[in-house]
């Protein structure tokens, strides 16, 4: 099964990994942060601001791969501060209120100044 690298200017890029990969009917979105691609800086310093931007970035990568939020079957979330869990859920519920995908949340063990959240997704087009 051939794989297609997904790129978009509507989400931040890294020289170390692809924004996303499409393999057959699966679309994989790399860990995506709350960086605003137009400024190159974090979209804010609250968990709600960064979660909103990270989800916006993930959605842009999904679109570039031919998928949408309704196609997402799994989401992985890494938080730098466990106390942000409730704020994360507050913003997350605005995006996935009915028939949400599976999800896990874990603590991110890497300390990056300003980073509060990283989100990855898997979508299925079947």
Task: List each model region and its residues.
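N-terminal presequence-like segments and the immediate start of the first folded domain
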Residues: 1-56, 60-73, 79-126
């Amino acid at each position: 099964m051939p794989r297609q690298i997904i790129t978009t200017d509507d989400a931040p890029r890294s020289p170390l990994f692809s924004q996303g990969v499409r393999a057959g009917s699966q679309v994989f979105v790399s860990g995506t942060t709350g960086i605003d691609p137009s400024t190159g800086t974090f979209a804010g310093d609250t968990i709600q601001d960064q979660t909103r931007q990270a989800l916006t970035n993930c959605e842009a990568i999904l679109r570039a791969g031919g998928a949408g939020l309704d196609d997402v079957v799994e989401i992985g979330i890494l938080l730098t501060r466990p106390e942000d869990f409730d704020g994360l859920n507050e913003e997350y519920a605005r995006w996935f209120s009915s028939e949400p995908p599976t999800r896990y949340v874990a603590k991110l063990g890497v300390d990056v100044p300003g980073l509060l959240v990283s989100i990855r997704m898997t979508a299925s087009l079947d």
